[in-house]
Amino acid sequence: MEIIARLANLPGALPGACAQGLIWGIMAIGVYLTYRILDVADLTVDGSFGTGGAVCVMCLLSGMNVWAALLVAVLAGLATGLVTGLLHTFMGIPAILAGILTQLALYSINLKIMGKANQSINVDKYGLLISLRWVKEFALHNPIIMVILATAVVIGVLYWFFGTELGCGIRATGSNPAMSRAQGINTNFNIVLGLAVSNALVALSGALLSQYQGFADVGMGRGAIVIGLAAVIIGEAVFSRIFHNFALKLASVSIGAIIYYIVIQLVLTLGFDANLLKLLSASVVAVFLAVPYWKGKYFSKPVKKAKEDAKKCLRSKMFPKPSMQAR
């Protein structure tokens, strides 16, 4: 009976979970660009997410228009991606380490931007685009509606951009860097640009979340990469067989973030210890990442293995290794 009573409170919490899922979904789209398109493990996300929130709040507190504040936050995120990209391409630092270095530096930068660990902003005094206060209202300024529109614009712009020559060059760089260089594509430039675009989206998500919750915190991006990966993996697991278009794949990532937050809300409603949420998230991501490997190693059909063995045998007959005498 206690479980049923708790579940009865779930519908009232779903609008907030959906709104948060949509906001984090924009960040997850940024993670998708580096993780799937560029094939780069970018850990800048944990820092650039907080940078977007910090810059947006401080711009609003200084009297700036909300749209201008969002633009400045996006540019700040773009700059963080540029730094990571240059550390990787110009200085030769491995991508994962370059992201860690930028993330570490951004902690101090975010503290400097805000002047302290957190800054709050009142929806009654400032014209915010979205707010937690409006999440249950049936109006145009409802955060769910506003973020759906923002997500649609983001997906539309990315779909157009990755259809251009420059966007196709970024996709080719992630797919096969050696072949891209052979075709005259500047892979270093594409990596830097891809990281910049990705972190610009992450910062946009951070800016929207800071408005939604009414404050920016220096640690608000901690664990963001795990949430982003969870959204990407859940979206692919649920929709990969039916969503083949690039725009639909991006939409599936956003839906994956919504599913993630609904599950989190369900778990919290059932009385799960909130202190263990990060452990749960990490475990879910680890399992979903391991599933493709387990499928190939333990659950592949014998017919497929026989075909692979036959192909290897055929190749060895067609291209025999030179004997020791021939050498």
Question: Where on the chain are the PLM-derived regions?
Answer:
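Cytosolic-side transmembrane-helix boundaries in multi-pass membrane proteins
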Residues: 175-182, 186-189, 248-251, 263-327
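Transmembrane helix-bundle core of multi-pass membrane transporters
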Residues: 95, 99, 103-163, 193, ...
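Membrane-interfacial amphipathic/re-entrant helices at transmembrane-helix boundaries
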Residues: 1-27, 55, 63-68, 140-141, ...
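Short loop segments and helix-boundary regions at transmembrane helix junctions
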Residues: 36-41, 82-125, 214-218, 230-251
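Alpha-helical transmembrane segments within multi-pass membrane transporters and channels
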Residues: 64-104, 109, 149-153, 255-256, ...
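Helix-loop-helix "hairpin" substructures at the membrane interface of multi-pass membrane proteins
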Residues: 80, 140-225
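Membrane-embedded helix boundary and interhelical linker motif in transport proteins
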Residues: 35-90, 136-140, 242, 269
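Transmembrane alpha-helical segments in multi-pass inner-membrane proteins
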Residues: 202, 206-278
